[in-house]
């Protein structure tokens, strides 16, 4: 008697085998689709993407780098290394298309490093699976059209990990330089440094001798930080090498109106983040004010602050519309807004009211298909974790990736959650998702 479950399993294996075996064609189509989106379906920047662009454009027009004199009285400084890259791009050609073409290059480089990391850790077959997993994760395609720092930041992280895995002092130093550059984009880069240090300390105690690898990595990191910080000091007067968003993120996750995610009510009059005359305070003074407000609240409401941790995790991992809406051309509507609207209004016709039925269908299909894929990746990752715990299969390489995700998640729990914050975590775990699929489903098949 034929077992239906075996038939389904065999069918799934055949489908996966067919997809992976055509990886070159899929990669070519992926590049073509990106080019088509960039030139024929450019996206209007909103939210942080628009804010980053305005910062870069103001500096470009005044022939300055970021931060500039006019940024002294901002609430905080964001992604200084990334903003300066955008300024240079605008000097080449002042258009958002220039940024998208840069993102296309970043995306392909990131894909290359994920492919090579997987190849180094496992084999060519698994590397091809990781390539397909990466391509099918549509947020990356959407990020190419936008101006967020996540794509560039993650490239710096994965390239640092790649060179860290090589046996060369020069490449260890390069790994450190890239690590320093990632910190220049987002403070979350510190999570990777801590991961490297934990692994190094383990080796020192295990082998009872000094390990030179972390020393060269730290030297490379400090080289970048000193170089970039000095560059900013000479044109801005302050040694700035990373974003100063830590205090405001801490406050967003530690106040009476905190929800676990971004909630602008904290800035309303009478609330913890309200500043009567913000234009009179420098970013340093504002940061000190936010940090004082947050830490005072945490001291008084420690249990409540700890209780917000699950909500921060939910806001980060519970849904995954980082850039999916942009692919449907509906950036004003995302999955969060849609759920809130349906909860309150419960009228499907009021969602995307100015769009055609075709756009509405495309929007919902993309959201549903992508979220099924996203949660499938999470399930496979959990299965990989369980399997490795049971069989004690963790290697130094896998632990670096895991520690980066764990420490990065702790940083989120301390501050505030956002679906964008997990993007690097998903990308760095793709090699291990691919390895689990290869070992459990495709081992008996030859992928040529």
Predicted regions mapped to residue ranges:
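Loop-to-helix entry region of an early transmembrane alpha helix in multi-pass inner-membrane enzymes
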Residues: 80-87, 92-109, 143, 364-371
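Membrane-interface transmembrane helices that cradle and orient dolichyl/undecaprenyl
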Residues: 122, 158-174, 201-206, 437-440, ...
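Multi-pass, polyprenyl lipid-linked donor-dependent membrane glycosyltransferases
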Residues: 47-50, 77, 98-106, 129-159, ...
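Membrane-interface anchor segments at the N-terminal boundary of transmembrane helices
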Residues: 98, 311-401, 405
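Membrane-interface alpha helices of multi-pass inner-membrane proteins
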Residues: 87, 130-131, 163, 172-187, ...
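Membrane-proximal stem/loop segments at transmembrane-domain junctions that anchor or position
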Residues: 241-344
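Extracytosolic helix-loop segments that constitute the early lumenal/periplasmic catalytic or substrate-binding loops
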Residues: 50-75, 81, 256-270
